[in-house]
Amino acid sequence: MFSDKMILIAGPCVIEGEEITLEIASKIHELVSPYADRIHWIFKSSYDKANRSSINSYRGPGLSEGLRILSKVKETLGVEILTDVHSPEEARAAAEVCDILQIPAFLCRQTDLLVAAAETNAIINIKKGQFLSPWDMQGPVDKVLSTGNNKIILTERGCSFGYNNLVSDMRSIPVLSSMGFPVVFDGTHSVQLPGGLKTQSGGQTEFIPTLTRAALAAGAHGLFIETHSHPAIAKSDAASMLPLKTFEALLPLWDQLYTCVRSFEMASV
């Protein structure tokens, strides 16, 4: 599906408007272009953040306008598009534009959503719920496979660890890999402090370099990174998104580490 390239799902958390979305996407495109032979970049952004902590928080432009903007990014940059869907109806609409449909972590056991998304024949990225063990992901995988669609990505995004905290267990990477599909590590949601700021989630971005290095060393096939030109004023997940300048600085490290781990794996076969 992605050959041996490192998968890099990257973009802003939520669509904040056409201009800034295209600006961020264009900058990521510029940064990853030198690695095009080794990194498979997929642009991500959400048209609706349906699980915001507060009723007053910005959710996004909505399905219709969001898909229009994602389509513009796709046409302008020639990049594959990923977005998350929340209902069977949204899955069918989003598949008209997006190459990859993402099942949110909180919804990863919703049978009707998984089946409807899979039936579009898009690639399905299932994010592991914070409440699930890695081996429990076989259930969601089987629901997608029941439709005949075997184009699956599994994303690890941390496990609930007491109140307002997540922990990343790197044993999850080989467990999920044993199911036969690419495993991506979500380096930004994994550093969230859910509800840690009362009406919004906090975050510890200083741990993103450590956790992403650990995940690639553990054998992850790629990374999921939410990034923004100015995270401090972003309308969603401001506390956990990676600044584009830091994203740029980490790219060569991720590339070298992924290549190194893959070379050792090939040598041991």
Curated annotation (Swiss-Prot):
Main location: cytoplasm
Statement: the UniProt record of this protein carries the keyword Lyase: no
Top-level taxon of the source organism: Bacteria
Pathway assigned in UniProt: Carbohydrate biosynthesis; 3-deoxy-D-manno-octulosonate biosynthesis; 3-deoxy-D-manno-octulosonate from D-ribulose 5-phosphate: step 2/3; Bacterial outer membrane biogenesis; lipopolysaccharide biosynthesis
InterPro entries: Aldolase_TIM (IPR013785), DAHP1/KDSA (IPR006218), KDO8P_synthase (IPR006269)
Keyword Cytoplasm on entry: yes
A single GO BP: keto-3-deoxy-D-manno-octulosonic acid biosynthetic process
Swiss-Prot/TrEMBL catalytic activity: D-arabinose 5-phosphate + phosphoenolpyruvate + H2O = 3-deoxy-alpha-D-manno-2-octulosonate-8-phosphate + phosphate
Keywords of the record: Cytoplasm, Lipopolysaccharide biosynthesis, Transferase
EC code: 2.5.1.55
Pfam families in the cross-refs: DAHP_synth_1
GO CC aspect terms: cytoplasm
Compartments where found: Cytoplasm
GO MF annotations, alphabetized: 3-deoxy-8-phosphooctulonate synthase activity
NCBIfam families, per the entry: KDO8P_synth, PRK05198.1
Family: Belongs to the KdsA family.
Name recorded for this polypeptide: 2-dehydro-3-deoxyphosphooctonate aldolase
Organism: Chlamydia felis (strain Fe/C-56)
